[in-house]
């Protein structure tokens, strides 16, 4: 035995692994029969224009695309600034404007 803990005689390369099955030698790496590869091509109808390059957009993850996120953040900024302007002009908070009493705590009897 050699001094290394993993001797090369213990492990064989995958290409040399084989088994005998019903008198035949089968390779473990490629135990499926190879099927012939058939290519079927069709001509495009007249007037169909083939794009020169495929678009390089990535598929959206649950609807979160870059463009949707940009528009969402812009709408949020407009709404937030609009809320600040309304509160500044009317000198009341948004909750006070819709009739919710604030500043009284939870008003729970203990």
UniProtKB/Swiss-Prot annotation:
Gene Ontology MF terms in the entry: chlorophyll binding
Outcome of substituting residue 69 to A: Abolishes chlorophyll binding of OHP1 and OHP2 heterodimer
Triggers of expression: Induced by exposure to high light. Expression follows circadian diurnal fluctuations with highest levels before and shortly after the light phase.
Stromal side: 42-74
Gene Ontology biological-process entries: circadian rhythm; photosystem II assembly; response to high light intensity
Protein family: Belongs to the ELIP/psbS family.
Protein name, as recorded: Light-harvesting complex-like protein OHP1, chloroplastic
Gene: OHP1
């Amino acid at each position: 035995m050699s001094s290394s803990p993993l001797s090369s005689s213990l492990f064989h390369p995958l290409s040399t692994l084989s088994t005998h099955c019903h008198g035949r030698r089968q390779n473990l790496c490629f135990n499926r029969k190879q099927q012939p590869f058939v290519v079927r091509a069709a001509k495009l109808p007249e007037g169909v224009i083939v794009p020169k390059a495929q678009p390089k957009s990535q598929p959206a993850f649950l609807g979160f695309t870059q463009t949707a996120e940009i528009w969402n953040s812009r709408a949020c900024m407009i709404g937030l600034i609009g809320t600040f302007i309304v509160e500044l002009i009317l000198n009341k908070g948004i909750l006070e404007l819709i009739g919710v009493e604030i500043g009284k705590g939870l008003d729970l009897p203990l």
